[in-house]
Structures are given as structure tokens and as C-alpha cells.
Amino acid sequence: MSSLTHFDAQGQAHMVDVGAKPATHRIAVAEGRIIMQPATLAIIQSGTAKKGDVLGIARIAGIMAAKKTSDLIPLCHPLALTRVAVEFDLLSDVSSVRCVATVETVGPTGVEMEALTAVQVALLTVYDMCKAVDKGMVMEGIRVLEKLGGKTNPSR
């Protein structure tokens, strides 16, 4: 097992120096889902939520969150993102909304934190917009599906 990179020899937190690393094309894909009552999913599907277009607003929130990740995660590097895509699947059989975020950059460090942040904030936005009708929603399964680029994960 490798050591934690965000701590120095004295155990103090620090931002990893990526200055000498080459800029490469990097991609990360993350997913998660929010489980809800079937009636809540029906409201999202029909577009009749009182606060507006739930998935449209959640998509924008996810994109904004990816761009602000370094403001939220203390030791995360600010990155110039070249692409952020946030997509949703409505899963009637399990009464949930699945979110998938794909983030890309050309830089010295990966974008998995940005992809994870996009998914989390998009799902939080779904929760916020639907909590008036369903306070029992649960987010789960947030994880990185794919990471490409850099020396440990060559680009496709």
C-alpha cells in the first residue's frame, strides 16, 4: 500500500507539489444515485416540481461544483477543466435517479475529485428541489468509475 500523499514526513498536511509533472490529458468518471419515493420520481419525470426543472438545475449545479472543487476541498489543486458533463438516468425499477459526471483536463494531476464533487452536488440539488415532497431520499453509491491519464492510468 502506498503512503498518503497529503502529509509530509512530520505528519503535517500539505498540498502535493505537481509542478514537475507533465501535463497530460486526464479524464475521470464518477457516479452516484439518489433513492426516492416513486411519486417523487414521477414528479421529476413529468417536470412538475414546484421549484422548476429538477434535472436541468441539478446538471448546472454539478458543473458549477466541478469548477469550484478546489474551493471546497482544502488540498485539491485548482485546475483548468476542459470538459464537464453531468448526465442523469431515471431508474423507475429502483425509484432512483443515477448521476454520472465526466470531467476532463490537460494538466499535471487528475480530475477524480472534480467528478465526485459534481455528482455529490448534483444529487444534493435533486434532494433540495424535492425535499418538500420526500424527506426520506437517500444518496448512495458515490464512486469513481474510471480514471484515465497520467503515469498510472495511461490515456485511452
UniProtKB/Swiss-Prot annotation:
The active site is at 128. GO terms for molecular function: cyclic pyranopterin monophosphate synthase activity. Pathway: Cofactor biosynthesis; molybdopterin biosynthesis. CDD domains: MoaC_PE. It catalyses: (8S)-3',8-cyclo-7,8-dihydroguanosine 5'-triphosphate = cyclic pyranopterin phosphate + diphosphate. It comes from the Bacteria. It is an enzyme of class 4 (lyase). Substrate binds at residues 75-77, 113-114. GO terms for biological process: Mo-molybdopterin cofactor biosynthetic process. Keywords: Lyase, Molybdenum cofactor biosynthesis. Gene3D superfamilies: Molybdopterin cofactor biosynthesis C (MoaC) domain. InterPro entries: MoaC, MoaC_bact/euk, MoaC_sf, MoCo_biosynth_MoaA/MoaC, Mopterin_CF_biosynth-C_dom. Its EC number is 4.6.1.17. Catalyzes the conversion of (8S)-3',8-cyclo-7,8-dihydroguanosine 5'-triphosphate to cyclic pyranopterin monophosphate (cPMP). Belongs to the MoaC family. Homohexamer; trimer of dimers. This is Cyclic pyranopterin monophosphate synthase. It comes from Delftia acidovorans (strain DSM 14801 / SPH-1). The lineage of its organism: Bacteria, Pseudomonadati, Pseudomonadota, Betaproteobacteria, Burkholderiales. The gene is moaC.
